[in-house]
Amino acid sequence: MLTNDDGFFSEGIQVLQNKLNKIGDPYIVAPDNEKSATSLALTLHHPLRVKKIDSSTYAVSGTPADCIYLAIQNILPCKPKFIISGMNPGPNLGQQDISYSGTVAGAIQGTFLGIPSVAVSTLPDERGKFHFDFSANFILSLLKQLIPHSLPQGVTLNINIPSPPVKGIKITKLGQKRYHPEIVSKKDPRERDYFWIGTGMPKAIGDKNSDVNVIQDGYITVTPLHRDMTDYDTLKNKDLSALFQRTKYEFS
């Protein structure tokens, strides 16, 4: 099954569906419009609508996470063997991107439901062109290897593919980006303030072996993400435990 946060009509998901027809019957269940930066949001305050576009494509009036829930419980004829979220036109690299990304969230939602899931994002070349066919060929080759072996329980793969030629593939950890978002302030016709949040141009910082830096060297990055977000080092921190014990006594 395929989903994304750009909409069922986006070039990346269409190219990927056509390519994966070689090894199966991939369904698209994706938003009916742009849903970037929605993370794991669910639509709870108004009903969702589903439109059948063709025999293997469904458009949902919701987020990527909504799409996964509806696909598994109401749309697909059977539980999918794999979920691919993407291909996103633009990177999803580093701790900040994956926290906001609807593309990554679609894959994480699949993992929550016990289905092996992968998020795929692509980077443009110097002219701004996305090489979706090249990226789809890589995903096709990868799935041939992954489907027989699945993924470890609770693990989602976050894959970012630079423009060709690529030097190879590296398993990486998440890096960090330093964002300086531009806040644009304007006034409406009634002189009320309103704002747009811009992303600005982020700068990669930190470990040279992290995804945000490795991809700049021309490598495909594959970053395993785990649904368990517990910080086990802090969990063992005796000072933190003592602090909360003192808080408990003062509170009671």
Task: Tell me the role of every PLM-derived stretch.
Residues 111-134:
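Glycine-rich phosphate/pyrophosphate-binding loops
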Residues 98-105:
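Charged helix-capping and loop-helix junction motifs
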Residues 78-98:
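Glycine/small-residue-rich loop that forms an oxyanion/phosphate-binding "nest" at active or ligand-binding sites
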Residues 1-20:
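N-terminal beta1-alpha1 ligand-phosphate binding loop
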Residues 3, 29-31, 61, 85-88, ...:
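Short beta-strand segments
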Residues 14-74, 78-79:
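A cross-family phosphate/adenosyl-ligand binding-site feature
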Residues 132-252:
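Electrostatically charged, flexible surface regions
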Residues 106-110:
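Hydrophobic/aromatic ligand-binding patch that stacks against planar heteroaromatic rings
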